Every structure is written in structure tokens, then in C-alpha cells.
Amino acid sequence: MAMAPSSSLPQVYPSHVVVAVWEWQDGLGIWHPYSATVCSFIEQHFVRQRGQHFGLGSLAHSIPLGQADPSLAPYIIDLPSWTQFRQNTGTMRSVRRHLFSQNSAPGQGIVWEWLGDDGSWVAYEARICDYLEQQVARGIQVVDLAPLGYNYTVNYATLTQTNKTSSFCRSVRRQVGPVYPVTSDIAVPRQMGLICFCQQCLHGSGTGPVSGRYRHSMTNLPAYPAPQAPHRTTTVSGAHQAFAPYNKPSLSGARSAPRLNTTNPWAAAPPVAGNQSLFHSSLSHLGPQLLPSGPSTSSGASASFPSGPSSSSPGSAPTTVPVQMPKASRVQQALAGMTSVLSAIGLPVCLSRAPRPTGPPASRPASKSHSSVKRLRKMSVKEGAPKPEPEQVIRKYTEELKVAPEEDCIICMEKLAVASGYSDMTDSKALGPMVVGRLTKCSHAFHLLCLLAMYCNGNKDGSLQCPSCKTIYGEKTGTQPWGKMEVFRFQMSLPGHEDCGTILIVYNIPHGIQGPEHPSPGKPFTARGFPRQCYLPDSPQGRKVLELLKVAWKRRLIFTVGTSSTTGETDTVVWNEIHHKTEMDRNVTGHGYPDPNYLQNVLAELAAQGVTEDCLEQQ
């Protein structure tokens, strides 16, 4: 039964006492909170085990949810991987931990729910519950959920939720129950030196967390055009302060081909507050297959959770989590010499040239608010433009050296004075195995045949990137699948940017088939958590970042297809090294506001991908 909210709910929560809410993510990217009782059980395990070194599948670090709620007997949470695992089906779901003030809705045991078509009540995610509670406490009877990425309004007077596009209504209610657990493990993120374990920071390469990646609010990221942005690589002394992206490997298959990195992505400390929030948006252009069953959609589909917690017969606690990462084949090992260099410094592993993007599916015409990004569906390479020959690209950006320097080629790991390690794998009439050259801007030296092999394993778009310092030659493009980017604006301010409104970016990428530039050409790929909502301040610098993100989207640089480092799922769409703010406030996870250095840092990340203000002048 719905109850009136407390009128004493403050607008800002000054208390340092916090409560923890654990949520799981369904296949459509929607987050669902566990009950307060289950959250208390999970939190006890989490606080007790933080700081320990986890082993994948260790019983000590697997939380059997059936011990807290018998209806959840098939489910366990594996803390090292931040994953909920269903034993009888093998389904894996991401989980996250959010911290709220003790004066918030979760801290008072308040849960808002909506009525599904099957007559069951479904809880909103905790952040929405808290937002609804704050707005109602201010005396707002009709609460618009647009700032959180939802196309709904909630009317407190009539206790209904209305789809703003279809006018379809559902009943809602406000319940008061047990409070969520108070936690002593706040772990407020520091400004510098803290490793980030989010999906954006854990690349789709399946190589685990980056040991030493800078935090989002890091203050000393190098400004463009400094090429040596710190990533997972380690600096070594030398004439050019080059980067050593991996230890010198043992030989397998082709000469000097490094072994593919198959590091366990779960063998690391978990994030403080889970993964980034991925909010649902039922914008009318989205196909019904991309819309979750709740909150309400125009089709009125029933709410269901096919792979999340559900009623089942009780079972015993598991002993292991049967998760297996794919093993590297000999072909992958041979390719690693060219591609692991790029993946190690935060670039997607590309196997061939990018496919020509296909036209978008039939949908309604874009409104005026959409028109500014509709053109981003097209690739930056003009239709029918001839692609240069690979040897021509290498010659264009290099100078041949008569005498090879006394150093290693970091692509094949052989001395520059001896033949290229790819001489038995790459055929070229124009470039011999002993030919050595240096890149014209950064002066780093390589076997030209190694550069050719690296280029041929990429998009072959006429651009080249130095594997040592990341200097870009030409216009770099990525492997992002086809999708849609839309931009909206609303008046609510972001914390730290109270003098302006907010820009909402909605990315939507559907499931599809991988092209020749992806890890498994011809096979399907998944796109979890779309549409994804991201936030920028509507300030001059925020608008500049927006325009550069449009360029990055056009060049297919924002997402790629790879292995999720949080769930281990292969052939799925993952972020590609350009960090986005997916939460509006409470910057506990590093993906919200306030963050005074975010705009400066994302400009540096865009510059590292070759997207600078000069690109705007060329448009």
C-alpha cells in the first residue's frame, strides 16, 4: 500500500553515514535492486572479504543468495568478477554496489514499484527510487524521469506512471520496508592514483584490469599532442622514451610472435561501487526488441526477468563458478605480435578493413533535435573513394634508414639489424625484410615490413598509429558497429555545473553480425545495456566535448566489439577508451558528477584518438 513520503527529506544529504544497495543487470541493461534482506547478506560478505586476493570460483568468495532468500537458491554472486551466476542455466549477469546517504530513500527503506502486466510489482532501480522521493518531498506531484533517461512521468497524486510518447499508464506504489544495510566500507574514490575497474576502463580485450590506469578525475593527464599517455604499458629508458607493451615472449608458430595475453579478467580487486549505470530510454525510434518490458512501453509488454532472480526450488551452495575464458589459437598467437601492441595501449584489435556501413533500418524521420547527429551514420571515408595501397601508406609516413639503430623492433621483438619477425608471414614486393624506417613525426624506428603487417591487420583506412607513442598519422577510424547517437538538452544542472543545463547523449547500438574487422567475422555480436545515457554540462567546454564526440562517433571510435572485462562475455559491444559520465550525481563510482577535471581529461582522451579541435575546423 502506498504511503506518504516524509516531509523532512532534505534536498542534499550531508551525512557521511551511507547504506549499500546491490543491484543486478538484466539482458536489456536495466538494473534491479535486490531486497534489503538480500543486500544485507551480500554486504556482510563484501565487507568481510574486501582487500583479499580472490581466486576465480573460490567458495570463500562466492555468495549463495539462497541462504538469504530461498527463492534465489539457483543464484550465486562471484565477488571477483562482480557477476551473478545462475547454476541451472549458466546465465551470468553483472552486479553493482551503490552507496546512498542514510537519509535517502534506500536508507529509510522506501522502495517505489510499478505494476507489471502479470500483476506483479517490480521495483525501480534504487537511484530512481531516491530521485522520486526527493522530488515528491519538494512538493512536485508530477515527476519527469527524463533526467535519468526514462521517457516517463510519475504522478504522485494518482499513483500512475505515464509513457510520454504513447500515453500508456501503469500503476505505481510507494512501499516502506526494511532499511538497506548501513556500511562501514565507504571507500570514497581519491583524485589520483586509484585504479579504475569499470567496464569503460577494462577494455574489451579480455586482459583484465589495467594496473595503474589513471582515474577519471586525474589532474595530470598529458595535454595533446603529447603522445605518451600512460596506459597499461611500462616505460623503458631509451632515445625516444618508447613504451614496452609486453614482456618479450617465447616463440610459438611464426618467428618472434608473442603469445596472446589470456590473463584472467577476474583476478583483481573489485570496483568500489560496481559498473557504470546504463539507463533505459524508451525513445520512440527504438525497436520493440530493444525495449525492456518495464517500466511501461507503448506495447504494454509484460514484465519478466528470464535470467535474473526468480522463484525456484531450493538448492545447495555451489563450490565453483564454471567460467571459462577462450583459449588462444595458433592463428591468434601469430596475430598477437601485430595486434597486442595496439590493444595493450588501449586500441581495438582489428583483423581486416572495416565494412562499408549499411543503411539504417526503417524508422520514423528524425526530429529537429535529432538532426544534428543523423549525419553521423555515414563513415568519414567518402563513398567510392579509392583506398591507398598498404605499401604506399607505410612509405607516406616513414623515412627509410640506411643504418639500422641498435635497438629492438617492438612489433616483432627482433633487433632492427636483423630480418623482420614477420618476413615469413607477410608478402611484399616493395618492402624487404631487412628494410628499417622511422616514422616522420615521432621518429620511432621499426621494420617497415612489421609496420605493413600491423597496418594490414587493421582497418586499412589510410591511417597509421605509432605502436610506441600512439602518434596518429592520417585520420584514424575504429571498428564500432552501426548505431545511432542522439542528443537532448534539459534545464536540470549537474553537480559542479550549477550555472548551466545538461546535455544528454543517448547511444543505441543493436545486436548484429560482425564484419571482417571484428574478432569473429560473420558471427553475431551482442549489444548489452543499450540505449546508454551519458551526461555533459551544457557549457561552452561541454558543447565542445559534444562536438568532438560526434566526430569520434562518425569515425567509429567510441565503441568496439570485444570481450567484456566485467562479465567475460565475448563478441559483445564494449567501450573504447573514451570515458563517459553515465551518472548525473554521487560520484562514488567515478562515473558521475561532480568531477572538476572530467572535461579536460576527456579532451585528452579524444586527442589520443586523433580527435581535436582541428577536426571541427575541417568540417
UniProtKB/Swiss-Prot annotation:
Q: Where is this region: Disordered?
A: 243-271, 283-328, 355-389
- What is any one GO biological process for this UniProt entry? protein ubiquitination
What InterPro entries does the annotation carry?
Deltex_C (IPR039396), Deltex_C_sf (IPR039399), Deltex_fam (IPR039398), WWE-dom_subgr (IPR018123), WWE_dom (IPR004170), WWE_dom_sf (IPR037197), Znf_RING (IPR001841), Znf_RING/FYVE/PHD (IPR013083)
Q: In which tissues is it expressed?
A: Expressed in testis and the CNS.
**Pathway note:** Protein modification; protein ubiquitination
| Annotated compartments | Cytoplasm; Nucleus
Q: List the disulfide bonds.
A: none
Q: What is this protein called?
A: Probable E3 ubiquitin-protein ligase DTX2
Q: Write down the species.
A: Mus musculus
Name the gene.
Dtx2
